[in-house]
Amino acid sequence: MTRNWTESYLGVYREPEGSVRDSLSDHAEAHLKWRVLNGAFVSGEKIREAALAKELDISRATIREATRRLAGAGLVEIDAQRGVFVRTYTLEQIEDISEIRRALCSLTASSFVSRATPTDRARITDMFDRLEAADGRAYEPADYVLGLLFNEAVVRAANNERLFTLYHEAWQQMRIFKLFLRRHVFGAVDVQAHNHSMFSQGAVHRRTLYQAVLSGNEADIADAMRRSADHSLLRAQEQFADYLAATQSTWREKIVSTRTPSGNPAGG
């Protein structure tokens, strides 16, 4: 089955339906991607192929095909001996990914200026107007999705399939890194709280990007996109520092809990 790259298949926008509309491998991939990008499986966690195949009522071979696709997108790692795991990224790798994302901003901006159609621009304006309307009421989970779609619409308007793919791979990899940190800092992944936080923090960057799009100035568009990328990396670095503090604190507590009041190891 050939995909239409202009249709969103991120897997974070809505939970896959129970019925199979596409191929079985697409169906399996959608379910896996949804769970990885929404914190059901976090970095380092093993994906139980047999259990998943039984749950979705499809073969393990189909699950394996889906995991191979996700491995190509940098979401999972396949070990021939140990199985399939959600990919774990180091902070250094995330910084490298962010550097690539920054470099793509200039190409996105130049392609947008030369290739965006009136329909593309109208779609961006419509989404931004809906985002502005959302500011006047209480936050809803769908608002986060709309924010993603707005940013995606700008990249889509560059009308470059490979650029679109690279943009989303970088976004997805950053997301699973942050969800992993959140799990280890808070002990659980509250995806709705995470999405709400991301939506609120992104408001100023969306407004700056929209103003740049209206101006049609290539440098302004690139700068607005880089500012957003830089902010995302900064938040990842801050969350990583929180993760280090939390894990070190937990380790110290474990050491203390195994010692008697005299300071000797318990049972010694």
Predicted regions and their residues:
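C-terminal all-alpha effector/ligand-binding and dimerization domain
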Residues: 2-9, 20, 180-268
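Residue-level detector of alpha-helix boundaries and kinks
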Residues: 17, 93, 109, 135-139, ...
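Amphipathic, non-membrane alpha-helical segments in soluble helical-bundle scaffolds
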Residues: 64, 91-98, 118-121, 164, ...
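Residue-level recognition of short, well-ordered coil/turn positions
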Residues: 40, 75, 139, 217-218
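Short linear motifs at protein or domain termini
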Residues: 1-114, 119-120, 237-250, 254-268
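Conserved amphipathic alpha-helical segments that form helical-bundle/coiled-coil interaction surfaces
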Residues: 118-185, 202-212, 218-231
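Residue-level signal for well-ordered alpha-helical positions
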Residues: 89, 169-170, 177, 235, ...
